[in-house]
């Protein structure tokens, strides 16, 4: 009797561990659901929007200018950030806010990207902490799933910061 209960308990524990490992691999390497908080990506992404993040992108496809990505924060590695890619390695990017009279530029180093929020006045991004290493990128946002009235792919940058060549 006890042997049968122990056997069933161990079997259930084994299945739980298996499914836990499968779920971990799926969320880590294939994709995950992300709930965004904070105003840095408004109006494109609002507080508590639910997004689908494609984690395969970082392994098999190139990250492009204009993509919205999820990355580990360079300042706080335990926190994920959701920002738009403004520059790729070798690109010249503007470090100043759009309202600044004197514009400062820099080049994105090899193996890094330049990230900015769409709400430039209320975003802590590469203008604060500098270029972000590719290794910190977790995935690319591909779809908004909630709220349902906004279901679908995300819009282009509303502030026009993505340019091929800065003056």
Swiss-Prot record:
<feature type="active site">
    <location>
        <position position="40"/>
    </location>
</feature>
<dbReference type="GO" id="GO:0004252">
    <property type="term" value="F:serine-type endopeptidase activity"/>
</dbReference>
<feature type="active site">
    <location>
        <position position="83"/>
    </location>
</feature>
<keyword id="KW-0645">Protease</keyword>
<dbReference type="InterPro" id="IPR019533">
    <property type="entry name" value="Peptidase_S26"/>
</dbReference>
<comment type="similarity">
    <text>Belongs to the peptidase S26 family. IMP1 subfamily.</text>
</comment>
<protein>
    <recommendedName>
        <fullName>Mitochondrial inner membrane protease subunit 1</fullName>
        <ecNumber>3.4.21.-</ecNumber>
    </recommendedName>
</protein>
<dbReference type="Pfam" id="PF10502">
    <property type="entry name" value="Peptidase_S26"/>
</dbReference>
<keyword id="KW-0472">Membrane</keyword>
<comment type="subunit">
    <text>Heterodimer of 2 subunits, IMMPL1 and IMMPL2.</text>
</comment>
<keyword id="KW-0378">Hydrolase</keyword>
<keyword id="KW-0496">Mitochondrion</keyword>
<comment type="function">
    <text>Catalyzes the removal of transit peptides required for the targeting of proteins from the mitochondrial matrix, across the inner membrane, into the inter-membrane space.</text>
</comment>
<keyword id="KW-0999">Mitochondrion inner membrane</keyword>
<dbReference type="GO" id="GO:0006465">
    <property type="term" value="P:signal peptide processing"/>
</dbReference>
<dbReference type="InterPro" id="IPR036286">
    <property type="entry name" value="LexA/Signal_pep-like_sf"/>
</dbReference>
<dbReference type="InterPro" id="IPR000223">
    <property type="entry name" value="Pept_S26A_signal_pept_1"/>
</dbReference>
<dbReference type="GO" id="GO:0005743">
    <property type="term" value="C:mitochondrial inner membrane"/>
</dbReference>
<dbReference type="InterPro" id="IPR052064">
    <property type="entry name" value="Mito_IMP1_subunit"/>
</dbReference>
């Amino acid at each position: 009797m006890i042997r049968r209960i122990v056997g069933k308990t161990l079997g259930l524990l084994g299945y739980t561990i298996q499914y836990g490992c499968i779920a971990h691999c799926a969320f880590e390497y294939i994709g995950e659901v992300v709930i965004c908080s904070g105003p840095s990506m408004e109006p494109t992404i609002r507080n508590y929007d639910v997004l689908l993040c494609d984690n395969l992108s970082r392994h098999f496809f190139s990250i492009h200018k204009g993509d919205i990505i999820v990355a580990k924060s360079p300042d706080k590695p335990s926190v994920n950030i959701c920002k738009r890619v403004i520059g790729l390695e070798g690109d010249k990017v503007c470090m100043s806010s759009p309202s600044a009279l004197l514009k400062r530029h820099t080049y994105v180093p090899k193996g890094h990207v330049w990230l900015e929020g769409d709400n430039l006045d209320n975003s802590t991004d590469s203008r604060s902490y500098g270029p972000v290493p590719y290794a910190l990128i977790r995935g690319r946002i591909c779809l908004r799933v909630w709220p349902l009235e906004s279901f679908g792919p995300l819009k282009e940058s509303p502030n026009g910061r993505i340019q091929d060549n800065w003056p």
